[in-house]
Amino acid sequence: MGGKEIPTQLRGYMASWKQFMPEWEIHEWNEKNFSIASAPVYVREAYEHGKWAFVSDYVRLWALEQYGGVYFDTDVQVLRSFEPLLVDTAFIGLEESLAQLPGTCVIGCEPHCQWVKDMLALYNDIHFVLPDGSLDQTTNVQRMGEMLKTKGFVACRKEQYIAGYGLRVYTHDYFSPITSTRVMRKSKNTYSIHHFAGSWTNKKHHRLRDTWLVRETINALIQIKRKLKGID
């Protein structure tokens, strides 16, 4: 989204996806294959204001609900195949931050997953432009965390399973071992590294910037699609 070319460094990270999962298909989502005009008013307003990060929050969920697969932010470097993780209906990982909420740099699910359907529904009746003219800066991480808490999620550093959704929540070392203070904490569990390559918040919101350095600079939605439970 936004039409910017993906930088060389990020293309290097993306090459790691194909290196470790050569049989998977890589799909990019943008204005050519997603209809902004048909999206909820929240998405249209965010797009009109050039807030690509918030547009991508919705579009990644839409693509996953439609097709299933694994979504990666383009600043995610893969270290090994994700095949062993394809045992649950859906999976996501925590980010190492004070809030201990699930991050969105890596999301995996089967097509038509109820968890993702419920996340999409959160956007149906809200506006990006608030009545006073300000913009709704609520991140998808905040929305997701609050919604999952109603299903039993607890903000802590432990792996969790949300049975109602078939959702596995992995610890931060699986997908995002770099902490908000830039300390690398890889482990035997690590499948990928989130490099926090871009920023969409200002210095006033430094904690969120350190934790969610993604998307607006990248402006590309990448979905890795594969055959999941017989779905092409």
What are these regions (language model features)?
Residues Y58-G69:
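Small-residue hinge/turn detector
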Residues M1-S56, F72-D232:
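Glycosyltransferase-associated regions of secretory-pathway enzymes
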